[in-house]
UniProtKB/Swiss-Prot annotation:
GO terms for cellular component: cytoplasm; nucleus. Endonuclease which cleaves flap structures at the junction between single-stranded DNA and double-stranded DNA. Specific for 5'-overhanging flap structures in which the 5'-upstream of the flap is completely double-stranded. Prefers the blocked-flap structures similar to those occurring at replication forks, in which the 5' single-strand overhang of the flap is double-stranded. Also possesses weak 5'- to 3'-exonuclease activity on nicked but not gapped double-stranded DNA. Does not cleave bubble-like or Holliday junction substrates. This is Flap endonuclease GEN. Residues 131-227 are annotated as: I-domain. The keyword Hydrolase applies. One of its GO terms (molecular function) is DNA endonuclease activity.
């Protein structure tokens, strides 16, 4: 169990790192912790000797990572722990005897009085397994975690692997928790991982060491006082730790029972209503808040930093003291002595890896693990070869490397695969023939495949340098030999005398021109503009209120020429100077003039062409009119050409010219009645107008007739033709 609530305080300061961080280090392992952890796995069916199986594979993993393990066995349990051991035995053997049995009421020694007889038997099996693997085991005088902490505190090992937080109370400096080599579960890791707790760093950060851990064990609970002090938790203990240093906390706790008068005076002062709870001076808190404090020299309120925080801290400590003194044996000096006591002598540990015993493992451990002999050989043989590679200078050598098969890389470490052989036949007859026959049937290489192992390259270079050098030399690629033969002098003479021999091509190297002779950029850009073809610019279109292509479909936009009806210059000239005389236009020495016409020539021509189409449709057309009539209106427009649209303009209400668009937009009548004017009236282009009247304006005014008079005007008007005379 350990110290209650201790892991919650230390976990924020731990570091999760891979197990290869422990490479080359010596670690002390609480063997009882690993065994209890394996025995508590009851959620699913496991191996009947799960603790042995788990111990074997975990130890193998440490060997592959070049970590030196030191397993510490349990000694004589302290008397303080007898109560805890009895409760554990009751939970372990529950259901064996009825609770109300008369035998239980008799004053007979129970099984719990025998101590750890059954548990020690399990530890003895584990010790036999470890000795067969050549791993060092150490017997502790008392608790295993206490001896592990002792070895770590005196520098004999680099750390402690344990799940019990009691090792911190015993003085452990570096603890490895949650050791895992599995790829499944909550503590899974790809290559093995462990939580590292370094008390040196934790003490420097929060002033939390062994003495405070002992006080926490007395107040919150531990293996020697499971219940602790009722009503005291982690938060109250941490507030007490913040008030006192690591070296003061244990003496302060011992003074709770001895210095009664001192704490009684503190209780009277803390609870005194005549003393201000903020500043600690004489006077009530309410009066100081309103009128101020004369000692603090304030007119309103008082200095809270003098007494308020200190009062709360003292009050919290007095509350813990009051609860702790309810226990008659608090503070228990036996528990404090158990955590602070150490063995008298420091042992001389021989941490060298001893030779593994394959025969002992198969004979003694194989039946406990319920493994067949060939499986035991397959799992244990790599341990023997690794020991021989590391301890190659030993005189007693059992097997020899036969050859190196190939290169390998294991977790980024360069390695080699070897095949070993047994020259003295020590392992002959160790595996039954039946198992060998079954193995050879499944593996084509036969029994020799059991003698294949993978070892690190650096270890092999130290142990067997000649074998490694020969293998690496055999893997080197020889230099490539040129297959081209050198020509002799006679062959060269014959080649020169051949008539068909082609002369050698001489490659001329072009020298780079100096920068002074290089052409400049403006010489490339300075071309003649006279003969250079230039793209004609697009005609500029003027924006107006009525776009040119507003009432025309897309295929008739090209039929209109905007420049032909551009009268902007004429309008500007009239507006800018209305009194100016118009310029006369001559043609072959004669002045041009015109006669007004009643209708638009283009409109008249369109009506005439429309009438001809309705009376006699042309036979030459190749369109199928029946199919065209069935199409929608938009499709029919797209199938007809521009001439058809011009002819059917009146029916489709389309504008054919810009003038017609202007009339349709402003609802100007297309049929204009002939105004009554003098016969000698001439165009505004000439300066012969009578009565100084603008004929163009009169023409426009007369054109604004209602739309409903259009039909009547059509019957009355006659066709007027434009006459242009020389």
């Amino acid at each position: 169990m350990g110290v209650k609530e201790l892991w919650g305080v230390l976990t924020p300061h731990c570091e999760r790192k891979p197990i290869n961080e422990l490479r080359g280090k010596k670690v002390a392992i609480d063997l009882a912790g690993w065994v209890c952890e394996s025995l508590n796995v009851v959620d699913y069916f496991v191996h009947p000797r799960h603790h042995l199986k788990n111990l074997f594979f975990r130890t193998c993993y440490l060997i592959w990572e070049q970590v030196t393990p030191v397993f510490v066995l349990e000694g004589v349990a302290p008397k303080l722990k007898s109560q805890v051991i009895a409760k554990r035995n009751e939970l372990q053997f529950r259901g064996v005897k009825p609770k109300n049995s008369p035998e239980c009421t008799q004053s007979q020694p129970s099984k719990g009085d025998k101590g750890r007889s059954r548990f020690n038997h399990v530890l003895k099996q584990c010790e036999t397994l470890l000795l067969s693997m050549g791993i060092q085991c150490v017997q502790g005088p008392g608790e295993a975690e206490a001896y592990c902490a002792f070895l770590n505190k005196h520098g004999l090992v680099d750390g402690v692997i344990s799940q019990d937080s009691d090792c911190f109370a015993y003085g452990a400096v570096r603890v490895y928790r949650n050791f895992s080599v599995s790829t499944q579960g909550a503590q899974a890791a790809a290559g093995g991982a462990v939580d590292i707790y370094d008390m040196r760093e934790i003490t420097s950060r929060m002033d939390f060491g062994q003495q405070k851990i002992i006080v926490m064990a007395l107040l919150c609970g531990c293996d020697y006082c499971p219940d602790g002090i009722g009503g005291i938790g982690k938060d109250g203990v941490l507030k007490l730790f913040n008030k006192y240093k690591e070296t003061e906390i244990l003496d302060r706790m011992r003074s709770w029972r001895g210095e009664t008068d001192k704490y009684n005076a503190l209780e009277i002062r803390v609870d005194d209503k005549s003393i201000c709870s903020n500043c600690g001076h004489i006077g009530k808190t309410q009066s100081h808040t309103k009128s101020g404090c004369s000692v603090c020299r304030t007119h309103k309120g008082c200095d809270e930093s003098l007494w308020k925080e200190q009062r709360l801290s003292i009050k919290s400590e007095l509350t813990l003291r009051r609860k702790a003194l309810l226990s008659p044996d608090f503070p228990n000096e036996e528990i404090i002595a158990e955590f602070l006591s150490e063995p008298d002598t420091i042992p001389n540990l021989n941490l060298n890896w001893r030779q593994p015993n394959l025969v002992k493992f198969i004979k003694q451990i194989g039946h406990l693990l319920q493994w067949p002999e060939i499986y035991c050989f397959q799992k244990f043989f790599p341990i023997l070869t690794r020991w021989q590679v590391q301890q190659s200078k030993q005189e007693k050598i059992l097997i020899q490397p036969h050859e190196i098969i190939k290169k390998r890389t294991v977790k980024g470490v360069p390695s080699l695969e070897l095949r070993w052989h047994d020259p003295s036949g020590i392992f002959k007859g160790l595996i039954p023939d039946k198992q060998i026959a079954e193995y050879e049937a499944e593996h084509p290489k036969g029994i020799e495949e059991l003698y294949y192992t993978i070892e690190p390259l650096d270890m092999l270079e130290t142990a067997y340098p000649d074998l490694v050098a020969a293998f690496l030399k055999s893997k080197e690629k020889p230099a490539k030999k040129t297959t081209r033969k050198k020509k002799t002098a006679s062959e060269e003479e014959n080649k020169e005398n051949e008539p068909n021999s082609k002369p050698k091509r001489v490659v001329r190297k072009i020298k780079a021109q100096p920068e002074e002779n290089q052409p400049l950029l403006h010489q490339f850009l300075g071309r003649k503009k006279e003969g250079t073809p230039v793209k004609a610019p697009a005609p500029q279109r003027q924006q107006c209120s009525t776009p040119i292509t507003k009432f025309l479909p897309s295929d008739l936009e090209s039929d209109c020429d905007a420049e032909e009806f551009d009268m902007s210059d004429i309008v500007k000239g009239i507006i800018s100077n209305p009194n100016a005389k118009p310029a006369l236009t001559n043609h072959d020495g004669h002045q041009l003039h015109y006669e007004p016409m009643a209708e638009d020539l283009s409109l008249r021509l369109a009506q005439m062409s429309l009438g001809n189409v309705n009376e006699s449709p042309k036979v030459e057309t190749k369109r199928d009119l029946s199919q065209v009539d069935q199409l929608p209106q938009s499709k029919r427009f797209s199938l007809e050409d521009s001439f058809d649209l011009l002819v059917k303009g009146d029916l489709q209400k389309l504008a054919r010219t810009p003038v017609e668009r202007f009339k349709m937009q402003h609802r100007i009548s297309e049929k204009i009645p002939t105004p009554v004017k003098p016969l000698d009236n001439i165009s505004y282009f000439f300066n012969q107008s009578s009565d100084n009247a603008d004929v163009f304006e009169e023409l426009m005014n007369s054109s604004l007739v209602p739309q409903d008079q259009e039909d009547n005007a059509e019957d009355e008007e006659e066709d007027d033709l434009v006459v242009i005379s020389d």
